Regions:
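Conserved helicase/translocase motor-coupling segment
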Residues: 1-45, 110-142, 148
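Soluble C-terminal extramembrane regulatory/interaction domains of multi-pass membrane proteins
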Residues: 41, 46-50, 61
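Conserved RecA-like P-loop NTPase helicase motor core
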Residues: 51-219
């Protein structure tokens, strides 16, 4: 499930940072490959221009809680004698629960879970990719992100830790070839991106490139 993938990604973030630092200190250029950016797990909680006091992984569990109120129903369109059926996603409103429960028991249970999630501290980042990038940048390295993410979480102070205060910021559209050139010619020290990021470009060490440091792939 998306939440399990998010958890595994968040757990591995610190390990990936240390692995990248080791390669950089050895004189290599790390290329970090990821399966997904997990952007949707936080864009449902925060929009560009907003601040998040605590970028805690546990907050993505709020998405799971909200998903419990979603269900699929059959709808139909009729054209002449032909009837076409299709699925539509609908959402229960909290008020709808009163149709099934005679008291506020369900509402109290929901509020309890929300409070529990908001107070949970796992010390894991809500956006592992942002924690990785900004942790390395804080060490003085230049990192390029080759993904299609539109919103990033900018840490107010990365030194505070993985779950510090962040601000949601719109990300500029990247020029894939330009970023590859910057990596190959020494402007960037590290690349992180989806597994298909290198399609159509060369990230290998070559005499044609200024930066001759050995490339190391970390997955």
């Amino acid at each position: 499930t998306p939440t399990i993938r998010q958890l595994l990604f968040s757990i591995k973030a610190e390990e990936a940072i240390q692995a990248a630092l080791e390669q950089l200190k050895a004189g290599h250029k790390p290329i970090i490959q990821i399966n997904r950016t997990m952007e949707s797990n936080y864009t449902s909680l925060i929009q560009p221009g907003m601040a998040m006091p605590k970028a805690e992984f546990a907050l993505c569990l709020l998405n799971c809680l909200k998903d419990m109120f979603k269900y699929k129903a059959l709808a139909a369109t009729k054209k002449g004698k032909a009837v076409k059926y299709y699925e539509v996603e609908q959402t229960f409103d909290m008020k709808d629960l009163k149709k099934f429960f005679n008291n506020d028991e369900a509402k109290k249970a929901y509020d309890f879970l929300v409070k529990k999630i908001n107070s949970t501290d796992t010390s894991l980042p809500l956006s592992p990719i942002d924690y990785f990038v900004q942790s390395l940048e804080n060490k003085g390295y230049k990192v390029g992100e080759m993904t299609q993410r539109k919103t990033i979480l900018k840490y107010e102070n990365i030194k505070v830790g993985a779950t510090g205060k962040t601000h949601a910021v719109m990300r500029k559209k990247i020029d894939k070839k330009r970023m590859a050139s910057d990596f190959n010619n020494g402007v960037l020290d590290v690349l992180i991106g989806n597994r298909v990021m290198s399609s159509g470009i060369s990230l290998h060490c070559s005499d044609a490139f200024t930066d001759q440091r050995k490339r190391t792939v970390i997955t």
